[in-house]
Amino acid sequence: IDGYVEMPGRGLPPERFGGGRRDVRIGYGGGVDLTVGHGTVGTPGGLAALSLATQHYGRLPWAEVVEPAYQDVKNGFALSLASYTYLEFASRKVFGWNEPSFRALHDSDGRLRRPGETIWIEELAHTLRRIADFGAEEFYVGETARLIASDMQANEGILTFEDLATYKPIVRRPLVTNVEKWRVATNPPPALGGSTLTAMLLLMQNEPVDRWGAREVAWLARVQEGVLDYRLDNLDLSDDLEADLDRLLREARMGELKRWVSSPSTVHTSAVDADGLACSITLSAGYGSGVMPPGTGVWMNNCLGEHELNRRGYHAWSPGTRLPSNMAPTVARHEDGSVLSIGSPGADRITTAIVQVLVNHLHLGMTLGEAVGHPRLHVENHGGEKVVAYEVGLPVDDVRLPVRRFDGLDMYFGGAGAAKRDADGTFEVAADPRRGGGTTIGGR
């Protein structure tokens, strides 16, 4: 179910585009350039997608699904260490210019709240209560929609009430590939994440990997480099994204991609149940626009201001266009009936995190906990210069690119979460220690 952000601006004159922006640089992950402000907010679709999934596959009434979130916000929730780590870089430049946003994160003296301190957003509790009582439609055509649209129009935003009212999630046929005795399904175009993940999985199978020695780590880096090169050269500015993604996968399946190889505000939840249903959900607000429309308590996304996903330029998409995405929620089914759900936040580290966890678990036989907690690497692109960022514990002696070492597990490398139901009915779950994830096994 594709519930990703759309380009807004339906019915607006051309002169309304291009404004509402603040260009900032934050120190997160070694330095990130991004754009925030009302003009960076795309049409959010996550709530509509969750509603559709609940209608098709859920057992509980919608109000009961929303109730735990409502109670957490109503009673106040603790600021997590992972959130605080990001906010140390972003609280002023991203969230500090908008008064409701700043007030939610800082005390009366202007101090950023510390990990474990309680966050109170009373207006968000009221919004969740309306959504629980009246359905997801409240966000798109009700009072919440009117509050959001009004704030956008008053502050150079291009998100309109028509954009919200028109938004519909799309059910797409997933990309499916075989890994060992597993069939792995992930999200298809126009998202980039699922296709690049699938290409990496296919390429990793072209060379024997029975451990993470220096040769295998070097091959992993070359696979990431090759897919990154293909993306930069063919996908980010593509006029026919689906055709170019099809070519990527075709060449990866045939091994032809070797010619390419040789040369924080995202969350994920994975769940499986006793009936063998697996659910993988990734939602993103980008880095955050800093915007909290008065009366809503809702932080809005900055998906139009994520530079790596908008290489065509600011506001270059046509209204109604579904934006590209790095997200890759994934499910897999073994021939013995076991099911696995997996995904990760982490911007362009999403796919590289997932592929390494899948290789660790499906191919190398690690437990889910071992697979998620194993050191990772990620090939970065800095203005055309590639660098391999890696966590200590991986032998990088044979890697041909410059390297950037992290001395321990770091939230920069994503926050994978996985849940598995084995054929015998037992459950296995794992949450990434890099981002303070949590797990639970329960039932009704």
Regions from the language model: what does each represent?
Residues 136-222, 227, 292, 299, ...:
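Catalytic phosphate/nucleotide-handling subdomain of diverse soluble enzymes
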Residues 206-284, 296:
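Internal maturation/activation junctions in enzymes
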Residues 217, 233, 237-240, 275, ...:
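Extended C-terminal subregions enriched in glycine
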Residues 63-74, 146-150, 212-228, 368-378, ...:
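Short, well-structured alpha-helical segments that form the helix of a local strand-helix-strand
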Residues 1-2, 7-8, 16-18, 158-160, ...:
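Active-site rim segments in enzyme catalytic domains, especially the processed small/beta chain
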